C-alpha cells in the first residue's frame, strides 16, 4: 500500500451505499475501510487511525451522534456526517457532538469527494506564522494554540476557523465567507455549520464563553476576532 494515500473510514450499515462510497473514494486515490456497526467504529478508529471518518447517523449498536461524541472526547479526526434530508434536528445534534460537516442523502459523488477533500486539505510547507487574539497565541505551522503556556486542544476545523479570524483582525466575516474560507463551500450552504462550530470554539478558547473576548459576534453580520 502507498503510505501517502489517505485513509477514509466509512461507517454505514447500508451495504450498497458503503460499496458505492468505497468505489468512488478508491477511484479518487483514497484507501477505505468499512464498518457497519456504530459500537465497532470506535475500535476501528483506534486501530486504523483514519485520516477522516464518513459517519452515518442511523447505525446499529451505537448511533452516529453518540459515536461522534465519544470520538471527539479524545480525537480530532475530521468527521463528515451522512444524513437523510428529514434529519434536520439530528444534523444540529451531530454538529454539536463534534462533526465537522455533513452531506445530505442522496448526494452526488462529486459533492461528497469535494467535502472530503476540503476537510483533508493541509498545507504541508506552511511558513512560520504566529498569530494572537488577546492572550491566545496561535502557532500556525505547528497547529498549536496556547494561553499563558497552556495548550488548548482544538480539532483541525476549529483551528482553521480561529486562524481565519486571527489573520484579519479588523475584518467582520459573514457566515457565507467563513463557509467558503474554512469549509471550502463554493455555493450557499447551511450557516448552522458556522454557528455551532463558533460555539464549540468559544467553549475551548474563551475564559467565559458567555462573555466572549476572542471570537466576537457582530450582530446581523457575522463574527470577528477580539482585540489583540
Swiss-Prot record:
Residue ranges occupied by any Response regulatory domain in the UniProt entry: 7-120
InterPro entries: CheY-like_superfamily, MtrA_REC, MtrAB_MtrA, OmpR/PhoB-type_DNA-bd, Sig_transdc_resp-reg_receiver, WalR-like, WH-like_DNA-bd_sf
Cellular localization per UniProt: Cytoplasm
A cellular-component GO term for this protein: cytosol
Post-translational modification: Phosphorylated by MtrB.
Keyword terms: Cytoplasm, DNA-binding, Phosphoprotein, Transcription, Transcription regulation, Two-component regulatory system
Record GO biological process: positive regulation of DNA-templated transcription
Residues annotated with 4-aspartylphosphate modification: 56
Function: Member of the two-component regulatory system MtrA/MtrB, responding to environmental signals. Controls expression of a number of genes including dnaA, ripA, fbpB and probably itself. Probably plays a role in cell division.
Oligomer and partners: Probably a monomer when inactive, phosphorylation may permit it to oligomerize. The monomeric form does not seem to be phosphorylated.
Name of the protein this chain belongs to: DNA-binding response regulator MtrA
Gene name, Swiss-Prot/TrEMBL: mtrA
Amino acid at each position: 500500500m502507498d503510505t501517502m494515500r489517505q485513509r477514509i473510514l466509512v461507517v454505514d450499515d447500508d451495504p450498497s451505499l458503503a460499496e458505492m462510497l468505497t468505489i468512488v473514494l478508491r477511484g479518487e486515490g483514497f484507501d477505505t475501510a468499512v464498518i457497519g456497526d456504530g459500537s465497532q467504529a470506535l475500535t476501528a478508529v483506534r486501530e486504523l487511525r483514519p485520516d477522516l471518518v464518513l459517519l452515518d447517523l442511523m447505525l446499529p449498536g451505537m448511533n452516529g451522534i453518540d459515536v461522534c461524541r465519544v470520538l471527539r472526547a479524545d480525537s480530532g479526526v475530521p468527521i463528515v456526517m451522512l444524513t437523510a434530508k428529514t434529519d434536520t434536528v439530528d444534523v444540529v445534534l451531530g454538529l454539536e457532538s463534534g462533526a465537522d460537516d455533513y452531506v445530505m442523502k442522496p448526494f452526488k459523488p462529486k459533492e461528497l469527494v469535494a467535502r472530503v477533500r476540503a476537510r483533508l486539505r493541509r498545507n504541508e510547507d506552511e511558513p512560520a506564522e504566529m498569530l494572537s487574539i488577546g492572550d491566545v497565541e496561535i502557532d500556525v505551522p505547528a497547529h498549536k494554540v496556547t494561553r499563558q503556556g497552556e495548550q488548548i486542544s482544538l480539532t483541525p476545523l476549529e483551528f482553521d476557523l480561529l486562524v481565519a479570524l486571527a489573520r484579519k483582525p479588523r475584518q467582520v466575516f459573514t457566515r457565507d465567507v467563513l463557509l467558503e474560507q474554512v469549509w471550502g463551500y463554493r455555493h450557499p450552504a447551511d450557516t448552522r455549520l458556522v454557528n455551532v462550530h463558533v460555539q464549540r470554539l468559544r467553549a475551548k478558547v474563551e475564559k467565559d464563553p458567555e462573555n466572549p473576548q476572542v471570537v466576537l459576534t457582530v450582530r446581523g453580520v457575522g463574527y470577528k476576532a477580539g482585540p489583540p
